[in-house]
């Protein structure tokens, strides 16, 4: 829908002024925030939900090279045995370069043609578990308001370090807040007062 993760990511990526590189069915731009997914290509060193940013893209005829700035530090010893080039590390972040093949290998265990990350200007509440951001914007439409449990709401509002903004209608706000029991609501109210 209009407020779905894929649509929001597309809209926000369109505001990135860098050149679009289309690879398969996906579009990538230098500057795109990304999240590594369940692919085992760099596991366990770079795991599901590792955050990063695309800092370089070099498409070739049969492969594409991505340079990613990770929000974690990796040293040369940790990187040995993985199929990426560890470049410089600065301010607690490492930069890696790796290639993805255009076509699938005949080896069923080979993920060499699978891009191991997704563009992540926006992520679902479920996908955001365990992550932190300086600024969080939450969109809760009327259609999903009744599905937001206390635990889901708590997860959503506690992803931020500094700024929180919730976009919802007055009706959706009332539905969600009325669904919480008294003790938990006081805790949530305290958390919200600190960020709103």
What do the PLM-derived regions correspond to, one by one?
Residues 1-196:
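Core RecA-like ATPase module of SF1/SF2 helicases and allied nucleic-acid translocases
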């Amino acid at each position: 829908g209009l407020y779905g993760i894929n649509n929001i990511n597309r809209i926000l990526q369109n505001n990135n002024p860098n050149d679009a590189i289309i690879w398969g069915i996906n579009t990538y731009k230098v500057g795109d925030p990304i999240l590594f997914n369940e692919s085992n290509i760099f596991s366990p060193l770079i795991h599901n939900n590792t955050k990063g940013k695309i800092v370089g893209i070099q498409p070739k005829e049969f492969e594409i090279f991505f340079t990613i700035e990770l929000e974690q530090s990796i040293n040369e010893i940790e990187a040995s045995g993985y199929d990426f080039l560890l470049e410089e590390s600065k301010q607690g972040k490492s930069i890696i370069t790796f290639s993805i093949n255009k076509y699938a290998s005949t080896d069923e265990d080979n993920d060499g043609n699978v891009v191991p990350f997704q563009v992540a200007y926006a992520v679902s509440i479920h996908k955001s578990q365990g992550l932190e951001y300086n600024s969080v914007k939450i969109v809760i439409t009327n259609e999903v308001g009744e599905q937001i449990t206390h635990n889901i709401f708590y997860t959503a509002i506690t992803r931020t370090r500094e700024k929180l903004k919730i976009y919802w209608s007055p009706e959706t706000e009332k539905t969600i807040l009325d669904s919480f029991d008294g003790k938990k609501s006081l805790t949530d109210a305290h958390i919200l007062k600190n960020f709103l």
